[in-house]
């Protein structure tokens, strides 16, 4: 007997609301999979994870030829992967941008396969957690719609680069786009999330002709899907095989409806400061993502909670609208205060050039 394709786009009746049972979490049940190329700050970031989650398992999944004995002392397991390489996907302001999707898939799955605990946090080597507040969000949003269950439990992801539409002036939709910078969930759910997407071809990664050229959300990018989209689209397709999303320009009303329903029922979206997510490289972006609704297109915690309260639980005490923690409010108002200044200074980038000319001219004369 042939199995019927599962679909969530045309329900025959209003979806049933189901509730996940509360689970007691502790660090001893968690494996941290720290994946990617070793960065100068990686050792310090591993120390922070060890300090904040002392009983957790630390798995470092990186490339062959990157051996350093100091990492052996702080991690429980080290995995050395063969590098599948990256592909040039765009030229932004004449700077080459690389698509590292295949690299992320290889190191993440190698780390997940080595992890021995029932819960896994996937962290990039240029990120860390500065506290353990992550665990407090696990049981906070238990209700879900029964016809949109992709994972056994929601996966926690940050608002940074979790999108519903682009932040470009066109504000084009970007379906199936949860963040891939950090994720925490049950190990079996994490395997479905990151393990369903195959390694993509060079054409898909960086030389794809868009089906609808006038719908490209970010014109400099030449991939078939954004990495985040490819990961989640294939995960969704593993459960709902009738789903079809040919490339990131192939969206319509039905796709957008399905995407939002799957995102809102399978993830917990938190602002970076709510879980202590930190990165030197992405520090400004992380601060911007803490703004409650001020970064166009991002799925912030307030956006997620508004949907959850309206769709699943009218009794939800909305965390992000209830001022949040003092630290969150400090970051929020500081960023709102500085954002106009930063925007103005970026527009005056030329102003620094005369000083740079004087500085390097003087150095050149001095050397002579």
Describe each region flagged by the PLM.
Residues 28-30, 51-60, 76:
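Short loop->beta transition adjacent to catalytic acidic/histidine clusters or analogous donor-positioning motifs
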Residues 61-114:
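Active-site-proximal specificity loops/subdomain of glycosyltransferases
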Residues 123-127:
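Short acidic donor-binding/metal-coordinating loop in glycosyltransferase active sites
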Residues 129-303:
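Catalytic core and acceptor-binding pocket of nucleotide-sugar-dependent glycosyltransferases
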């Amino acid at each position: 007997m042939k199995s019927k394709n599962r679909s969530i786009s045309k329900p025959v009746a209003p979806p049933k609301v189901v509730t996940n049972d509360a689970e007691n979490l502790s660090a001893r049940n968690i494996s941290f999979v720290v994946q990617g190329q070793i960065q100068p700050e990686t050792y310090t970031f591993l120390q922070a994870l060890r300090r904040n989650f002392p009983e957790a398992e630390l798995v470092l999944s990186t490339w062959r030829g990157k051996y350093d004995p100091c990492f052996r002392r702080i991690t429980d397991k080290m995995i050395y992967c063969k590098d599948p390489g990256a592909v040039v996907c765009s030229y932004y302001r004449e700077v080459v941008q690389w698509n590292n999707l295949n690299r992320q898939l290889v190191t993440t799955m190698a780390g997940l396969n080595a992890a021995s605990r029932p819960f896994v946090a996937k962290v990039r080597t240029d990120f860390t957690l500065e506290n353990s507040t992550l665990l407090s969000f696990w049981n906070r949003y238990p209700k879900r719609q029964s016809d949109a269950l992709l994972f056994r439990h929601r996966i926690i992801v940050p608002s940074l680069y979790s999108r519903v539409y682009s932040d470009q002036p066109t504000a084009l939709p970007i379906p199936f786009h949860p963040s891939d910078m950090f994720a925490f969930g049950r190990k079996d759910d994490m395997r479905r999330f990151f393990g369903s997407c195959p390694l993509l071809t060079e054409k898909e990664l960086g030389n794809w002709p868009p089906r609808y050229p006038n719908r490209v959300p970010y014109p400099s990018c030449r991939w078939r899907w954004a990495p985040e989209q490819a990961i989640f689209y294939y995960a969704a397709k593993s459960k709902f095989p009738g789903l079809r999303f040919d490339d990131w320009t192939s969206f319509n009303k039905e796709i957008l409806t399905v995407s939002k329903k799957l995102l809102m029922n399978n993830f917990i979206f938190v602002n970076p400061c709510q879980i202590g997510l930190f990165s030197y490289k992405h520090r400004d972006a992380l601060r911007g993502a803490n703004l409650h609704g001020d970064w166009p297109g991002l799925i912030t915690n307030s956006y997620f909670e508004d949907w959850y309260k309206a769709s699943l639980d009218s009794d939800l005490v909305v965390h992000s609208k209830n001022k949040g923690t003092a630290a969150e409010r400090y970051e929020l108002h500081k960023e709102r205060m500085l954002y106009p200044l930063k925007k103005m200074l970026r527009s005056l980038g030329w102003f620094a050039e005369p000083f740079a000319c004087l500085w390097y001219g003087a150095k050149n004369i001095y050397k002579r």
